[in-house]
């Protein structure tokens, strides 16, 4: 009887360990689809590159899905500049035939597009770390779905930011509490 109880307890511990580590596995293409497949806003919380003019950083960067297939992602991209909310429609091609699932955002007005590679996905916080190249350097970005953004708004104690820190890049914060309260 003791052997049976011991085997049962070991099985429970083993299963709990698998479930705890499941959030840290290398992300796959379905993780990318699951992350993007929401009608909520997805916020850019942290980014390693500075967006905006000198002393006028863009803030409250977000995307809201308008169409999602296994090949394409269309969305409304919004941000706040000089206290004014601005939005534009954008689209991306989704790729599963690479080491990391990719979202290739089409360029606007003749500018080249950007390839974002999903490097990390946390199912409990609904956050994702994307890698991309800018000016010949590897950069990172942390995006979070709206319903968990207040839990992951750059606090160093959560797994999302720890994964971001693995990129070993600068950290500019693009989300704050005013992003949800100010419409202009």
Short names for language-model regions:
Residues 2-184:
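A beta-rich soluble binding module of mature secreted/lumenal proteins
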């Amino acid at each position: 009887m003791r052997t049976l109880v011991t085997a049962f307890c070991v099985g429970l511990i083993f299963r709990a360990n698998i479930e705890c580590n499941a959030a840290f596995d290398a992300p796959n293409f379905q993780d990318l689809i699951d992350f993007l497949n929401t009608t909520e806003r997805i916020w850019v919380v942290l980014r390693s590159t500075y967006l905006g003019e000198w002393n006028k950083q863009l803030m409250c960067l977000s995307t809201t899905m308008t169409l999602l297939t296994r090949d394409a992602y269309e969305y409304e991209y919004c941000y706040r500049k000089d206290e004014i909310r601005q939005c534009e429609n954008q689209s991306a091609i989704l790729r599963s035939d690479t080491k990391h699932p990719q979202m290739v955002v089409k360029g606007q007005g003749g500018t080249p597009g950007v390839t974002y590679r999903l490097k990390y996905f946390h199912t409990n916080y609904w956050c994702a770390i994307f890698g991309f190249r800018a000016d010949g350097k590897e950069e990172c970005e942390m995006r979070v779905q709206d319903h968990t953004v207040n839990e992951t708004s750059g606090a160093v104690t959560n797994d999302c930011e720890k994964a971001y820190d693995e990129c070993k890049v600068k950290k500019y914060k693009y989300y704050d509490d005013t992003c949800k309260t100010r419409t202009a």
